[in-house]
């Protein structure tokens, strides 16, 4: 039996990719709590300049990731997903190490851009698992996989702040590089993929990829949904701490309260994502997606009228439980409506839309709050999500029957 015919243990691959997504999510969020402090340490002074450069070094990673993702997705479809996971983990490890050696803000900005160019571990992990799991378990598996990055993102800021306080800012970058290198080793030795490389001349062009889809308009609507999910999340991020401070009044532990309220949606998503993914496998991910979007709207509106941090925290916990279903449902529908031959590009296109949302969301939130106040941000975000719920309902209505009955290509 050839290596290409050897059965794949998809459960082992799911476990290892979950761990890889956890380490990647932790690595990225390790440096987030002190990013403005590191910018200041590199010589940027003055309130306006510090805000500008902090925003630039944060956003440029997502911007370059959006640009590079389709290229890496095409390469994954041609060369295999495992090699893309290895490239991403090792590349990000080297870049993180170099960040710890940066001597000025321009070097750091360039390295943040390079980090975006070399990233892509999580979308390639999704593509790998999507091509290996039994189709009737797609929702559960992708929901479970999504909790890896969420778990890492929750733990990262806590660990990063502790490490920075005790060993300094630069040391955290070196530790982050080590974490990513461990991710590389796990991927190298524990992930298995049977992939036959495809000649470049046999690869479909981007136009041919979309022409090959049974429902290209549906797939495009799923990309838009991913963008809006990130816009909705990112629009609240810049004003959350300030909004909590307004609600809490003069208290000494505002940072702790804000951190808790920022974290509770992720905790709720950890609990809900696998369960709602399994439910989606039974009743259809399109139903889960629409209901979760509507619930999100109904929870965002009262956030504009809360009077205490506790009220806001409860609503954000419930919002996180609903949000835990959104991206796994989108990813499952992408699996149902594409083939394994193009899954790398489909997931990379989706990642590009997410990255665009990550860039534009904070800009929208900051602009709305500057002109209309903190409370208006939640109403505007609710309006954006409501539009998405209506748009998704119309897009999913006609092809819902096909989307919930995946049988377009075989899996191991």
Swiss-Prot record:
Instruction: Check the record and name the PROSITE patterns matching this protein.
Output: MFS
Output the Gene3D superfamilies linked to this UniProt entry.
MFS general substrate transporter like domains
Keyword annotations for this protein, in alphabetical order, are: Cell inner membrane, Cell membrane, Membrane, Transmembrane, Transmembrane helix, Transport
- What this protein is called in its record is Multidrug resistance protein MdtG
Bilayer-crossing residues are 19-39, 56-76, 90-110, 113-133, 144-164, 171-191, 222-242, 254-274, 288-308, 317-337, 376-396
Which molecular function GO terms apply here? Answer: transmembrane transporter activity
Task: Classify the main location.
Answer: membrane
Task: Indicate the family of this protein.
Answer: Belongs to the major facilitator superfamily. DHA1 family. MdtG (TC 2.A.1.2.20) subfamily.
- Which PANTHER family does its entry note? MULTIDRUG RESISTANCE PROTEIN MDTG
List, alphabetically, the Pfam families matched.
MFS_1, Sugar_tr
Q: Which superkingdom?
A: Bacteria
Task: Kindly give the HAMAP family that the UniProt entry links to this protein.
Answer: MFS_MdtG (MF_01528)
Subcellular location per the Swiss-Prot or TrEMBL entry: Cell inner membrane
Q: Name one GO cellular component term.
A: plasma membrane
Topology relative to the membrane, per the entry?
A: Multi-pass membrane protein
Q: Sorted alphabetically, which CDD domains does this protein's record hold?
A: MFS_MdtG_MDR_like
**Species the sequence originates in:** Klebsiella pneumoniae (strain 342)
């Amino acid at each position: 039996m050839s290596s290409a015919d050897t059965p794949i243990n998809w459960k082992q691959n799911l476990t290892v990719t979950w761990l890889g997504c956890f380490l990647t999510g932790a690595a990225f969020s390790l440096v987030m709590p002190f990013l403005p402090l590191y910018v200041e340490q590199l010589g940027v002074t003055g309130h306006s300049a510090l805000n500008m450069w902090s925003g630039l070094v944060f956003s440029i990673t997502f911007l370059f990731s959006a640009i590079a993702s389709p290229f890496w997705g095409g390469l994954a479809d041609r060369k295999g997903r495992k090699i893309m996971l290895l490239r991403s983990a090792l590349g990000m490890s080297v870049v993180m190490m170099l960040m710890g050696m940066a001597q000025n803000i321009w070097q750091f900005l360039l390295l943040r851009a390079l980090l975006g160019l070399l990233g892509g571990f999580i979308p390639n992990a999704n593509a790998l698992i999507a091509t290996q799991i039994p189709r009737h378990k797609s929702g559960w598996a992708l929901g479970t996989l999504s909790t890896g990055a969420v778990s890492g993102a929750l733990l990262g800021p806590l660990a990063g702040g502790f490490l920075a306080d005790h060993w300094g800012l630069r040391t955290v970058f070196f530790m982050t590089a080590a974490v990513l290198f461990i991710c590389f080793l796990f991927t190298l030795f524990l992930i298995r993929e049977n992939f036959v490389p495809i000649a470049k001349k046999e690869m479909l062009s981007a136009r041919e990829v979309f022409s090959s889809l049974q429902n290209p308009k549906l797939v495009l609507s799923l990309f838009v949904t991913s963008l809006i999910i990130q816009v909705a999340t990112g629009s609240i991020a810049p004003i959350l701490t300030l909004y909590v401070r307004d609600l809490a009044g003069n208290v000494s532990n505002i940072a702790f309260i804000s951190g808790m309220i920022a974290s509770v949606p992720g905790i709720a998503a950890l609990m809900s994502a696998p369960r709602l993914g399994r439910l989606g496998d039974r009743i259809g991910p399109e139903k889960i997606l629409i209901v979760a979007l509507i619930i999100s709207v109904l929870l965002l509106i009262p956030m504009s009228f809360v009077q205490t941090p506790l009220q806001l925290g409860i609503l954000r916990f419930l919002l996180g439980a609903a949000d835990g279903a959104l991206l796994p449902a989108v990813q499952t529908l992408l699996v149902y409506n594409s083939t394994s031959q193009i899954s790398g590009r489909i997931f990379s296109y989706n990642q590009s839309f997410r990255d665009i949302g990550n860039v534009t969301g904070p800009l929208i939130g900051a602009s709305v709050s500057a002109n209309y106040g903190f409370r208006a941000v939640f109403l505007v975000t609710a309006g954006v999500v409501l539009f998405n719920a209506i748009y998704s309902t119309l897009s999913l209505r006609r092809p819902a029957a096909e989307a919930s009955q995946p049988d377009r290509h075989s899996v191991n």
